Amino acid sequence: HNPIVVRELAEAGVSLAENLDSAATGTVIIRAHGVVPQVIDAARERGLTVVDATCPYVKKVHVAAERLVREGYRVIVVGEPGHPEVEGILGHAGDDAQVVSCAADADALSLKGKVGLVVQTTQTAQNLAEVVAAITPRVQELRVINTICAATSERQQAAATLANRCDCMVIVGGKNSGNTRRLAQICADACERTYHIEEASELQAAWFTDAHHIGITAGASTPQEHIDGPDRPRIRRRGGRLRAQPRPRAG
């Protein structure tokens, strides 16, 4: 869902379909966030070829949610309400599933009996721990399945470490990307001069005034060439010493 990548795909002839009515014929590619199972079933019923590109880590959340439902748990999804990944998870989590974004949301829920938690893959471990602490005293049984993506956790930890060593941080990635926004917030907590950009053209010289060490990292949906391409030379031309965060492998 990176805006630049979506634009490049459109230029290559791949159109973005908001729903199946926009894809009357041909092949439908399910994006990494996944969808509710009814969408895939409906696509096949219409004779469309379905290429399921759902992230394997997201599929693990679907499987975990379905297992909790079978075992009699009410499922709570820790994540961003309305986010495409979360909407897809809800399709596997039973009719009484709900979404909480933080501990305060959990406090407002009416809970009883057996509750099972799954997590949007790009959430922080800290947020999960806070939600668990809020729910635990209020239920008979709580089962937590930590479905945070390992690569996401590693990237968040590395970004925090990098931000602590830098005078300025640049986060590259879509403004609509949940995991990129979380990276930006994590970096901002450690480095006041943190800037979230989608393209190198957004860089401003004033950001790097008196900055001796400049850190750069990116969200999971940002292609490596968008970091290695125009961004690094522009930052170096501002006179800063660049520290780049290596990308952890997913899996």
What are these regions (language model features)?
Residues 1-220, 224-251:
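The feature marks the mature, well-folded catalytic cores of soluble enzymes
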